[in-house]
Amino acid sequence: MSSLLKLHCIRPLPQRSVWLSGYKQKARCIHSSAANGDFMSWFKRKKQEEHQEPVKDTKQLIKDIEEGTNEASSQSSSNNKNRLELIPENFIGEGSRRCKRQKELKLAVSSAPFNQWLSRDKITSDNQLDDMILQATEKTLGKVDQDVQFSDLVAKFQFTKFLQSKSGYLIPDYELTTLSTPLQFKRYIKEKILPSANDPKLAYKEAEPNAIHPFSDNYASPNIYVVNDVTSKEQKSKYDTIMKEIQKLEDDATRKALETARSA
């Protein structure tokens, strides 16, 4: 009896083992394809599908173009039909704080009254200078004598301000400090300012401080020769000419060397 039970229990085992082996074989088929490493291509494909426009019929498209309907517009215009143009009418508000500040400053400067205290009409003769010094002396010092010392800094400031505003010339701070009488101011303007005002060659150059350039015409002696100034434009022109000549000589030398090498 025990032997029969053993045989009966042993028989179903091969069937189960075959079923398990078949289950494993079916499960392996799930992983038979190769893995796709480009995972982001799925999102790219979905995005392209969303923005893809349907293809229109050729006959309908030709008809729309002939009739001039809005549906026949180009693809670029259809994509941009819902976009606003960057024009001032489409902006709301006053912009950034910096732009607002610049507008306020521009408006304030344009509306501010500037005091043009320096005269635009400049004196050019000795007679005008004599009249100007006399007016400044009488108004600020109450005297006619031009060789009198200034009583204090206030009187000197009033005199120099009146003289500069009426003559149209600014006087350097060094001269304003060292000169002490109206006569000294008169001599300074007559010797330093009026000659350069009447002769542009004697004009003061800020790029070359204290540079008064003499010319050969100013000296009658035969043993004095003055070399005239060479401007930067003339220097550049001369330099370009020299470089062109050098380049030409080098090209000729190279050409002769090549001809000699070919003939050898």
Curated annotation (Swiss-Prot):
Keyword entries, A-Z: Mitochondrion, Ribonucleoprotein, Ribosomal protein, Transit peptide
Transit pept. (range): 1-75
UniProt main location, coarse: mitochondrion
Database matches in InterPro entries: ACP-like_sf, Ribosomal_m50
Further details from the record: Present with 1350 molecules/cell in log phase SD medium.
Function: Component of the mitochondrial ribosome (mitoribosome), a dedicated translation machinery responsible for the synthesis of mitochondrial genome-encoded proteins, including at least some of the essential transmembrane subunits of the mitochondrial respiratory chain. The mitoribosomes are attached to the mitochondrial inner membrane and translation products are cotranslationally integrated into the membrane.
Subunit field text: Component of the mitochondrial large ribosomal subunit (mt-LSU). Mature yeast 74S mitochondrial ribosomes consist of a small (37S) and a large (54S) subunit. The 37S small subunit contains a 15S ribosomal RNA (15S mt-rRNA) and 34 different proteins. The 54S large subunit contains a 21S rRNA (21S mt-rRNA) and 46 different proteins.
Name of the protein: Large ribosomal subunit protein mL50
Origin species: Saccharomyces cerevisiae (strain ATCC 204508 / S288c)
Lineage: Eukaryota, Fungi, Dikarya, Ascomycota, Saccharomycotina
